[in-house]
Amino acid sequence: MRYNQFSYIPTSLERAAEELKELGFDLDLQKTAKANLESFLRKLFFHYPDSVYPLSHLIAKNDMDALSFFQSEQELSKEVFDLLALQVLGFIPGVDFTEADAFLDKLAFPIHFDETEIIKHIHHLLATRCKSGMTLIDDLVSQGMLTMDNDYHFFNGKSLATFDTSQLIREVVYVEAPLDTDQDGQLDLIKVNIIRPQSQKPLPTLMTPSPYHQGINEVANDKKLYRMEKELVVKKRRQITVEDRDFIPLETQPCKLPIGQNLESFSYINSYSLNDYFLARGFANIYVSGVGTAGSTGFMTSGDYAQIESFKAVIDWLNGRATAYTSHSKTHQVRADWANGLVCTTGKSYLGTMSTGLATTGVDGLAMIIAESAISSWYNYYRENGLVCSPGGYPGEDLDVLTELTYSRNLLAGDYLRHNDRYQELLNQQSQALDRQSGDYNQFWHDRNYLKNAHQIKCDVVYTHGLQDWNVKPRQVYEIVNALPSTINKHLFLHQGEHVYMHNWQSIDFRESMNALLCQKLLGLANDFSLPEMIWQDNTCPQNWQERKVFGTSTIKELDLGQELLLIDNHYGEDEFKAYGKDFRAFKAALFKGKANQALVDILLEEDLLINGEIVLQLKVKSSENKGLLSAQILDYGKKKRLGDLPIALTQSSIDNGQNFSREPLKELPFRENSYRVISKGFMNLQNRNNLSSIETIPNNKWMTVRLPLQPTIYHLEKGDTLRVILYTTDFEHTVRDNSNYALTIDLSQSQLIVPIASN
C-alpha cells in the first residue's frame, strides 16, 4: 500500500479541535500531547465498556504495550506516535511491517509527527485511509460511533454516513419529456427510479443516466451482430460535408392535474456502489434509462440529443420545470418537493457518455458530472479514420446493435406486441444512416458528436479514464478535456487500467475527493477543498499517482524507424484466416509474438521518455492495389514488472459504504512481470489519409505520405527500454477482415515516429 492523499483539507488548530469535539473526542489544548493521544485512543474503543483491555492489545514500543506506556512517565515520541497510528489504521506489527520507519517511508505516510501539533495529527489521522480502504472516521461511523439521525454531519469538509439506509424511500415517477421519438403522437414518458433517505431537509441528487438499468436484450443484440469478414470497399473520391443542427424539443403545456400521493414503489435496482456511498451521506440516488427502455416510452435513438433530452427532462423536473406523473395513466402529477434541485451525474461507459451529453446542454441544475470511461464522439467509438472499427473486445458491434441491446421495451411482451413493428422500421432507418459500408463520417455521426457543443458546458466536470481502455479508447477523454471551456472547474484522473471503475482502489482516495467536491457543489459547504486538474497513475511502479498539468504537450521528439523497405502482406491462408476470425485473442497473441503478418521495428531508447499526448506515425507507404487499411500498435517490449490492466480484489468486503450497508471489495492493479504492454494503437483507411472529410483515391504502387495518429496516452519509458512498432493491415479484433491479396510497402528511411514528450 502507498498513500496518495488528495482529499485531506489542511485545517487550522482551532477548526480541528472544534470538529473533534463535535465527534465526541474529549481533547483539550491545555493537556499534554500524550494525554490527548490517550484520550483519543480510548474513544476509539467505544464498543467496549472498559478501554483497558483493547488498549493493552496495542503496542507503543517493541517492548511495551500502549496501556503500560500511558501509565508510565515516558514522554510521547515520534516512534510511539507512528507505531500507534499504524495500528489504529489496521496495520499489524510483525505481519505488515517490522521496522516502522522503513514501512512509513514505503507507505508515503502523510502525517509527520510534531508534539505541538498533536490535535492536528489526530484530525488528519481520522481522515486517513485504513488498510481496509476506508478512512478511519468512516470506519468508526460505520461501526456506529454516530447515530443515524438522517441529518448532515461533516468532518474535514466531507459528509459522514449518518442517514439511515434501512429506512430508505423507494419510489417511481414518470417524467414527461418534450419528445416523440417513436412518432406516435404522444410525448414520451421517462421512468425514474428514486432511492432517497428520509429527511426533513432538501436533498441533492446523484443521477445515473443508464440505458442498461431497465434490462438488456442480449438475444436481439447477438442476432444483430455483423460479420467482420468482408472486403474493404473502394470508395469514390469525394468531400464530406455536415452541418451543426440545434436540437429543438417539442412544446409542453403546464400541468393542471392534482398532486398524487400514492407512488409506484420497488424493492431493488442494481445500484452503483459509489451512489450507495453518497446515499448514506444524504444524497438521493435516481436511476434513469431514458427513451426506448422498459417502463418508458419512445424509440431508442442511441446517442443523439433526443436521447440526451430524455435525461435532461428529469433534471428539469427536479427543478420544477417539467411534469412527472404517478403512473402511465397520467391522472395525477408529482413534484420533487424533497429535492434541492442540484444534480451530479455518475456512471461509467454509456452512463458516463450520457453525462457528457447532458453537460453540453448547459441545463440548469446540473452542478457536476462524474463521467468514467465516457464517449465524447460516437463516430470515434465505432469508426476510426474512415474505417469501421469495433470497440475492443466486441467485434461486429455497431450502434444499431447497441440499440437492440438497450431497447428493453421489447422485453415487455405487451410493448413488443403493440410497438415492435414500428420499432423495426425505425431501427432499419438507423442501420442505414450509420453507413457501415463506407465507414465514413456523416450527419448521423455528427449529430452524436458532443465535442462540437463542449463550449456550452458550465458545470464542474470530473473524468476518469483508463489508458489501457481499448473499449472506450483514450481519445474520447483526451478530446473532451482539451475542448472544455477554460472558465469551468475540471478534473481528470488517468489510471493504468482498462474499462473499469476506480472508486474502490486502495492507492487513491477518489471516493473521499468526490465527497469533498460534492459537498461544495451540491450542499454549498464552504470547505476550501482544492483538487488538482489532472492526476495520473505512474506506470513504472505500483500505487503511485502524480499531479500533471496537461494531457497532451506540443514538444515532440522524432524517432527514426530505419532504412529498409518493409513489405506487409494482407493475405492469410484459409485455415489461419478462419482461426483468427474465430478467436481474435489468438490473433493478438500471434501479433505480439511477431508471427502474424506485420512489419516490425524495435527502437532501443537511449534516454528516459515521458510520452504525453498523441503519438503520430508519419509513413511513406504504397499499396499494391487501389485500397488498403493500415493498423499500428506501439509496445513497451521486453520482460519487466508492469502494472496489470485489471484490478484485483485485495479484500472481499472490507469497504462499508454506510453503517453496515453496501459492502464492497478493496481493489488495486497488480504489479507483475510480463513480456510487453501496449502503449497505443491506431487504424486508418488509406483513402482517408488526409482527414475524415476527404476521400482520396489510392494509386497502385505509388508512394503516399501518411500521418496516422495513435491513441493519446501518458506513459513513462526508461533508458534501455525497447519501443516496439508493429505495422500491419487487418486487425481481427477491431477492423473489417479483408483477406484479399494485396500488400503494403513501408519505406522506413522516409518514415518517423513522432512522440509528444513532457518533462518528468
From Swiss-Prot:
Any one Pfam family match given in the protein's UniProt record, by short name: PepX_C
EC numbers for this chain: 3.4.14.11
Subcellular location: Cytoplasm
EC class of the enzyme, as a word: hydrolase
GO CC terms, sorted: cytoplasm
InterPro entries per the UniProt record, alphabetical: AB_hydrolase_fold, Galactose-bd-like_sf, Pept_S15_Xpro, PepX_N_dom, PepX_N_dom_sf, Xaa-Pro-like_dom, Xaa-Pro_dipept_C, Xaa-Pro_dipeptidyl-ppase/CocE
Active-site residues, Swiss-Prot/TrEMBL: 349, 469, 499
SMART domains, per database record: PepX_C (SM00939), PepX_N (SM00940)
Gene Ontology annotations of biological process type: proteolysis
Catalysis performed (reactions): Hydrolyzes Xaa-Pro-|- bonds to release unblocked, N-terminal dipeptides from substrates including Ala-Pro-|-p-nitroanilide and (sequentially) Tyr-Pro-|-Phe-Pro-|-Gly-Pro-|-Ile
Entry keywords, A to Z: Aminopeptidase, Cytoplasm, Hydrolase, Protease, Serine protease
Subunit and interaction comment: Homodimer.
Its biological purpose: Removes N-terminal dipeptides sequentially from polypeptides having unsubstituted N-termini provided that the penultimate residue is proline.
Recorded family membership: Belongs to the peptidase S15 family.
HAMAP family named among the record's database cross-references: Aminopeptidase_S15 (MF_00698)
Record-given protein name: Xaa-Pro dipeptidyl-peptidase
Source species of the chain: Streptococcus pyogenes serotype M49 (strain NZ131)
Gene from which the chain derives: pepX
